[in-house]
From Swiss-Prot:
SUPFAM superfamilies: dUTPase-like. This is dCTP deaminase. Catalyzes the deamination of dCTP to dUTP. It catalyses: dCTP + H2O + H(+) = dUTP + NH4(+). Belongs to the dCTP deaminase family. The keyword Hydrolase applies.
Amino acid sequence: MSIKSDKWIRRMAEQHGMIEPFEPGQVRESDGRKIVSYGTSSYGYDIRCADEFKIFTNINSTIVDPKNFDEKSFVDFKGDVCIIPPNSFALARTMEYFRIPRSVLTICLGKSTYARCGIIVNVTPFEPEWEGYVTLEFSNTTPLPAKIYAGEGCAQVLFFESDEICETSYADRGGKYQGQQGVTLPKT
């Protein structure tokens, strides 16, 4: 299994629709102002956060249970900047839609710009033949409110291609998050 380069990422995005919309270069400015970078890097792709967020709240005094998740645990928010309360959590989604080839597995890591501020981005791997918008998990580990910027980079996806095609892909087993469109809450 080997990591894939910028050339491979560009080819797969442009010829096979692996990432849509796709940015073939690295974008660091928008309208003359510096932003958290996104787009193709040497061995990965920096994804952007869309403007749809679900922010944890305790106003309804629910219990967080991954097997029986209560949607009242979140407040929906739409905007260019999301403020995550101290020691709290928010969900978002990528601006990019992914179609992962059968021979590929991805690993997604948070960007150091956010990590150095105590904001941790967690995303599980994109499995072979999974497709959809990626649900992003942001943890504010600080005692202060933290900003997340929509339309800017938030994490980097690394692509690994196996030397052997898997017997059963995510699509084959009817994965529960296949084709997800918006911010998707836990399912069992």
